């Protein structure tokens, strides 16, 4: 009797696909840190990292070696267990958020019927990591940064979820494959433009990226909630932020820009090209926009994004009811 039954082979193939996809996501997040510095140098008329390797190509390797050998320091009077757990939760929750994204018709870590709800759950779990880091560090700047981050993230997650409800109502499913298949003729960005706009803004805010990086503002909070972190613990926070950018970019592509669909090229290539475009847009936003005050960020969310999201949802519901008659 052979152990390698068809069912076992299918399970092994699924596990292999999941490992490959998640490793690619981590690699993309790591390489984006180097690409961002090079692009920012280009935008600001300077060189950027160009000393290690040809044209700075080994800068990422040098950063990893440096981070690996730095002292793994824990501050006095801190809660060691929670201090250590926070970066692990941050990294894991952001990485698992990508699990529901189909990169091709047959490649996805998990094909869940509640795919969008799973993403919102993982995004909410990342808030606990920020709170744990701020509280366990026993540092006033860390705590202030954590309070800012949690309030901002929870506020913009409201708009993040509501902006997706128009797509869900239009398609009639929370499943990501169903959403991609529904865009065979028309991308969702056309009927759901305001949903796309609010989702993109909320995605930048949830990732704590410029101009919504008040929780980590160096001029005000000396790097915010991860001021006390060093070594690999800081590395998990650092790479996790870029994994969040990759995940939000992939979700924008999947939900509003047809996912892996496109002519001539293989599906995975289309998905990668579209995702790379929005990753570059994250960097361009950082290079071109100033940082507003924290109260302006919160007011913009509740006074602009929320009404826009609700109007989009009401308009979508009205169109669906009209077409059903």
UniProtKB/Swiss-Prot annotation:
GO terms for cellular component: plasma membrane. PROSITE patterns: COMPLEX1_ND1_1 (PS00667), COMPLEX1_ND1_2 (PS00668). It is found in: Cell inner membrane. Pfam families: NADHdh (PF00146). Keywords: Cell inner membrane, Cell membrane, Membrane, NAD, Quinone, Translocase, Transmembrane, Transmembrane helix, Ubiquinone. One of its GO terms (biological process) is aerobic respiration. It is a multi-pass membrane protein. GO terms for molecular function: NADH dehydrogenase activity; oxidoreductase activity, acting on NAD(P)H, quinone or similar compound as acceptor; quinone binding. InterPro entries: NADH_UbQ_OxRdtase_su1/FPO (IPR001694), NADH_UbQ_OxRdtase_su1_CS (IPR018086). It catalyses: a quinone + NADH + 5 H(+)(in) = a quinol + NAD(+) + 4 H(+)(out). It comes from the Bacteria. Its EC number is 7.1.1.-. The chain crosses the membrane at residues 11-31, 81-101, 114-134, 154-174, 186-206, 237-257, 265-285, 304-324. Its main location: membrane. Belongs to the complex I subunit 1 family. NDH-1 shuttles electrons from NADH, via FMN and iron-sulfur (Fe-S) centers, to quinones in the respiratory chain. The immediate electron acceptor for the enzyme in this species is believed to be ubiquinone. Couples the redox reaction to proton translocation (for every two electrons transferred, four hydrogen ions are translocated across the cytoplasmic membrane), and thus conserves the redox energy in a proton gradient. This subunit may bind ubiquinone. NDH-1 is composed of 13 different subunits. Subunits NuoA, H, J, K, L, M, N constitute the membrane sector of the complex. This is NADH-quinone oxidoreductase subunit H. It comes from Yersinia pseudotuberculosis serotype O:3 (strain YPIII).
